[in-house]
Amino acid sequence: LEKGHWVGFPVAFYTPETGFGGGAALGYIYPRLGDRHPSSIMGIGFYTEKNQTVFGMIPELYLENGFHGLIEMGYQKFPDNYWGIGPDTEDEDEEKYTPEVAEGRLLGEVEVRPGLRIGGQYRYRREIILKKEEGGALQDRGLPGSTGGITSGIGILGSYDTRDNRFSSSEGW
């Protein structure tokens, strides 16, 4: 078996919602089953000029028996803007708020035919609103989501992947 290798690169960007931001992505790729489906662990973190913070990590495993699993974990503290509900909001309706989000996903699937996998997943997301404008729409506790909340669920899934390499494919679906 080949040895694994580290990959890493800086992240720099600009969007109107974030301003300038920067951080890094780092990963370890272990080609236990060759180049087609290497197992890996990837992580990213960045910070923006608008005090937004995001961290994420995804360990992903491919086994010889056709099992594929991953655990996705993320954290965000992401000051943002809220305008209201519906298409008739105005720019003056804008109010600032800061949510904090922790989320995760657990996925497991097995290959039933070459390239075809079926399985299940569980997702969890907890959001807390840390800051909101005094007297704004989000101060109204009757507005769904104005205090945050938890979403959680399980589901079935299927995937079809015949790529010759999941990171840099030249053929397949």
Listing of model-derived features with the role each one plays in the protein:
Residues G149-W173:
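Loop-centered beta-sheet repeat module
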Residues L1-E2, N165:
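Short boundary motifs at domain starts and secondary-structure transition points
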